[in-house]
A protein has these predicted regions:
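Active-site beta->alpha loop and helix N-cap motifs at the rims of alpha/beta catalytic domains
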Residues: 2-13, 37-74, 78-167, 172, ...
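Surface-exposed amphipathic alpha-helices with a cationic face
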Residues: 18-29, 55, 103-116, 166-178, ...
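Active-site-adjacent loop and "lid" segments of alpha/beta metabolic enzymes
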Residues: 48, 128-134, 191-201, 229, ...
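C-terminal helical cap(s) of enzyme catalytic domains, especially alpha/beta-barrels
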Residues: 74-94, 98, 234, 270, ...
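A structural signal for small-residue-enriched, beta-sheet-centric alpha/beta enzyme cores
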Residues: 200-204, 216-224, 231-233, 270-273
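Short beta-alpha connecting loops at secondary-structure transitions
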Residues: 249, 279-281
Length: 315
């Protein structure tokens, strides 16, 4: 029998395939924390990746945002390539923590947790703008090669990623790599298209039929109109369709005061979601660390939070 993600250690995660990880999340009964961090932001603390910081404050899953699979970079991580700048007398050495060339597997070794990346489902005419961040089959395969445990097909603000584009992207990516990696689908906001194109039961049906393992809906109290009852109905629709459900806090409220974050966490748990996500909109590409910890404590108490924070990577 699979371990609950609450009890899993770094060595446990190394042995899990996508089916085992999904079961581990399911067994935790709504007590899984996913923290999103911007891979290419200057980290909150010098020479420590935001992924490490989020993991240290209680995250079970780390989602990289802004990670380009064609030009990998995770600020704060040891690099695998040198950078030469015209206005510098010497190249910046590879061991300077710019994280040039850092793979997802490199991040996993640093944090001892499952790590995945977002791929944006942008309109075809905008694909060149986003390069290795676009949800294409080739980029998905590259992300898997780089070590991704999950791929989140969604849309960042202003990308124009519609629910239709996400559904199509999920179908293509799931067909190509769905047997190797968890597929997450869904937006936490309009992605530049307004409130009408955030989520619907029809979108949920399409995502599930396309092959999504986890479907995302906005957390209660985030996007306008996302009440507890409304979000609970969407979560029930997701479970009825088969996938796991994740509530997402992607409206910059992850950078609000601790009490607001606690309220959103508790309402999210009341919806019946399997995973509760906290976004990356702090001052430096991640939520304030104390908010991640408060978010975790709210949904599973000090015992499980401190355990996750303290567990050694050597276990």
């Amino acid at each position: 029998m699979a371990k609950r993600i609450l009890d899993a250690t770094a060595s446990d995660f190394e042995k899990m395939d996508q089916a085992a990880l999904l079961e581990s999340i399911h067994l935790a009964e709504g007590r899984t924390v996913c923290a999103e961090v911007v891979a290419i932001s200057v980290p909150l603390v010098h020479a420590v990746t935001n992924a490490e910081m989020a993991a240290a404050f209680g995250a079970d899953l780390i989602s990289l945002n802004g990670y380009d699979v064609l030009h990998p970079m995770v600020m704060g991580a040891p690099g695998r390539a040198s950078l030469a700048l015209a206005d510098l007398p010497i190249p910046i050495p590879a061991d300077f923590p710019l994280g040039l060339g850092a793979s997802i597997s490199d991040v996993k070794r640093l944090v001892g947790r499952p790590v995945g990346t977002k791929l944006d489902c942008v309109p075809p005419e905008r694909r060149d703008e986003f390069g290795g961040r676009v949800a294409t089959v080739d980029n998905a395969r590259r992300a898997v090669e780089l070590g991704a445990d999950f791929l989140w097909l969604a849309g960042n603000p202003g990308t124009g990623a519609s629910t239709d584009l996400i559904a199509r992207g999920v179908a293509e990516v799931a067909k190509a790599v769905g047997d190797q990696v968890i597929i997450i689908a869904g937006k936490m906001h309009g992605a530049g298209l307004g409130r009408a194109d955030v989520v619907s039961e029809e979108a949920i049906r399409r995502y599930a039929e396309a092959g999504a393992d986890i479907i995302v809906v906005p957390a209660p109290g985030t996007v306008p109109g996302a009440t507890l009852e409304y979000t609970k109905d969407l979560v029930e629709a997701i479970h009825a369709a088969g996938p796991l459900a994740m509530t997402g806090m992607g409206t910059s409220q992850e950078g609000a005061d601790v009490e607001t974050v606690r309220q959103i966490a508790m309402m999210s748990k009341m919806t019946g979601a399997d995973i509760l996500h906290i976004g990356d909109a702090g001052f430096s590409g991640m939520a304030p660390p104390e908010n991640i910890m408060a978010f975790s404590i709210a949904i599973r108490g000090q015992r499980h939070t401190y355990r996750r924070m303290a567990l050694s990577l050597r276990r």
